[in-house]
Amino acid sequence: MLANYTRSAKALSALLQREGVEDTQVLDAIAQIPRHIFVGDVLQHKAYQNTALPIGQGQTISQPYIVARMTELLQLAGVRDKVLEIGTGSGYQTAILAKIFTKVYSVERIKALQWQAKRRLHQLDLYNVAMKHGDGWQGWESQAPFNGIIVTAAAAKIPQDLLAQLADGGVLLAPIGEQEQKLTMVIRNGNNYTEHVIAPVRFVPLVAGDIE
């Protein structure tokens, strides 16, 4: 299967389309990105299943449907260019974003994961991504504002620093809650922030600080 990952990735894209993902750019990105390089060798046989998988350090690579749906929501909201990702993790979501948006900034608190993700993105010739090892709660102030912000770990509430770094008219997507999490879209209009609950989800927690 892995020797012919293109067929497997296309099959995954077709599955996500049947599950309700409609954006053709997102589906094309899923079909083009080899998900198996973002997981360990022992789990590569599961790489093209629609399921989350462990990647070490207590973290996971998100379910492909969630990756596709969150990316699609940014597209539908009109985000086109500058996107901040909080929680690089394996780099799979980063790669999908890089296929669609002009410039992607990604922050990862665990340095080992950040370096692994950077190597994978270079392997795929994705050079429109800037990566940083740091505390995701703080965002990336020096590169703000961002038209879109996507948070790939759950917080009890959205960190204020991230809201402040959202451009006027920009869109933030994040899983909110502790025991019961809900994917939430926040749209900024001047100093007003409007929240829309999208769906129940399950993510690892967004932890403050960073790890060397």
UniProtKB/Swiss-Prot annotation:
GO terms for biological process: methylation; protein modification process; protein repair. It is an enzyme of class 2 (transferase). It comes from the Bacteria. InterPro entries: PCMT, SAM-dependent_MTases_sf. Coiled coil: none annotated. Keywords: Cytoplasm, Methyltransferase, S-adenosyl-L-methionine, Transferase. GO terms for molecular function: protein-L-isoaspartate (D-aspartate) O-methyltransferase activity. The keyword Cytoplasm applies. CDD domains: AdoMet_MTases. The active site is at 62. Its EC number is 2.1.1.77. It holds the Pfam family PCMT. GO terms for cellular component: cytoplasm. It catalyses: [protein]-L-isoaspartate + S-adenosyl-L-methionine = [protein]-L-isoaspartate alpha-methyl ester + S-adenosyl-L-homocysteine. It is found in: Cytoplasm. Catalyzes the methyl esterification of L-isoaspartyl residues in peptides and proteins that result from spontaneous decomposition of normal L-aspartyl and L-asparaginyl residues. It plays a role in the repair and/or degradation of damaged proteins. Belongs to the methyltransferase superfamily. L-isoaspartyl/D-aspartyl protein methyltransferase family. This is Protein-L-isoaspartate O-methyltransferase. It comes from Pseudoalteromonas translucida (strain TAC 125). The lineage of its organism: Bacteria, Pseudomonadati, Pseudomonadota, Gammaproteobacteria, Alteromonadales. The gene is pcm.
